[in-house]
Amino acid sequence: MTATLERRESASLWERFCSWITSTENRLYIGWFGVLMIPTLLTATTVFIIAFIAAPPVDIDGIREPVAGSLLYGNNIITGAVIPSSASIGIHFYPIWEAASLDEWLYNGGPYQLIVDHFLLGVCGWIGREWEFSYRLGMRPWISVAFTAPVAAASAVFLVYPIGQGSFSDGMPLGISGTFNFMLVFQAEHNILMHPFHQLGVAGVFGGSLFSAMHGSLVTSSLIRETTENESANYGYKFGQEEETYNIVAAHGYFGRLIFQYASFNNSRALHFFLGLWPVVGIWFTALGIMTMAFNLNGFNFNQSVVDSQGRVINTWADILNRANLGIEVMHERNAHNFPLDLASGESLPVALTAPAVIG
């Protein structure tokens, strides 16, 4: 008998890199989308931390009145933010090399664009990485589909809305109070509370929280006990077991009698599909609503007040909401314009003496 020994060809450095990148045995899966995700998210995180701590004031309104957002310039964790790019930049791409100097780039809010652009690329890479990992494990792709909802929401407030409004200065500041300021101004300018897509988003988020709490409490209340009374019920289960952990029939029967029969699910797959679908679709609609309002397709405006036969105003909640919107609009960007256009366009009325009808 003759034994033939062949010399094993060593894989090239590129082949070994490809094998390592796509291996599902790594402690953290990287994948080809991870090659995009990791550097972009690291860049966004690093620049955000530096800018939040030490960035100089930014001329956000383009009127040579810089606004300080960093900790070293007098802010705290609540008031601090990375200030959006200047209105003088508009929606132009503004990398470091487009500025005459680093000081000019910082003064015009360049870090905001750098952070937002890298962050959006990074979270898109995260979606792709979730799909890629699921594909290599033979799983279905719904995890990545669900994550498109928060990515759509982030894209709406950081990219689509500024483009629609004509300037990245209208984007959401990267900070706690800056986020609240963005929400208030958005309400004043677009009446988002009266937009049906935002209302669907509220139903999605609050409904998803309710359904999650209901499902979790029903499951933990109907566990199938595999241990004695002297042992913890947790010892009766192991990860990946074939047997069911809880009794869905008991949970279904309880909930069906608590509310009514058809309010509960008797199919586990349908139940969990619904639990995933409800909040995701709600957030999709919210993101779509932000994108439509970016181009000034706003929420419902009931601008014509209800009046009686004598012409006197009958105050409704719509009147209160309109007044609140006008008040917020007067307060924001107070130095950028002398008076909001929708207040300056009508005839001057003695507001302190009468309650005028709000006419759009």
UniProtKB/Swiss-Prot annotation:
Which InterPro entries does its entry note? D1/D2 (IPR055266), Photo_II_D1/D2_sf (IPR036854), Photo_RC_L/M (IPR000484), Photo_RC_L/M_CS (IPR055265), PSII_D1 (IPR005867)
Q: Summarize where Fe cation binds, as residue positions.
A: 215, 272
Name of the top EC class for this enzyme: oxidoreductase
Q: How is the cofactor bound?
A: The D1/D2 heterodimer binds P680, chlorophylls that are the primary electron donor of PSII, and subsequent electron acceptors. It shares a non-heme iron and each subunit binds pheophytin, quinone, additional chlorophylls, carotenoids and lipids. D1 provides most of the ligands for the Mn4-Ca-O5 cluster of the oxygen-evolving complex (OEC). There is also a Cl(-1) ion associated with D1 and D2, which is required for oxygen evolution. The PSII complex binds additional chlorophylls, carotenoids and specific lipids.
Site annotation Stabilizes free radical intermediate: residues: 190
Name the chemical reaction catalysed here.
2 a plastoquinone + 4 hnu + 2 H2O = 2 a plastoquinol + O2
- Site (Tyrosine radical intermediate) location in chain: 161
- List positions binding chlorophyll a PD1: 198
Q: How does it sit in the membrane?
A: Multi-pass membrane protein
Please give the Gene3D superfamilies that the UniProt record associates with this protein. Photosystem II protein D1-like
Q: What EC designation does it have?
A: 1.10.3.9
GO terms of molecular function: chlorophyll binding; electron transporter, transferring electrons within the cyclic electron transport pathway of photosynthesis activity; iron ion binding; oxidoreductase activity, acting on diphenols and related substances as donors, oxygen as acceptor
What positions does the entry give for [CaMn4O5] cluster binding?
170, 189, 332-333, 342, 344
Which positions does UniProt annotate for a quinone binding? Answer: 215, 264-265
Xref: PANTHER family: PHOTOSYSTEM II D2 PROTEIN, PHOTOSYSTEM II PROTEIN D1
- Name the family the entry cites: Belongs to the reaction center PufL/M/PsbA/D family.
**What is the protein named?**
Photosystem II protein D1
The organism of origin for this protein: Guillardia theta (Cryptophyte)
List the gene name. psbA
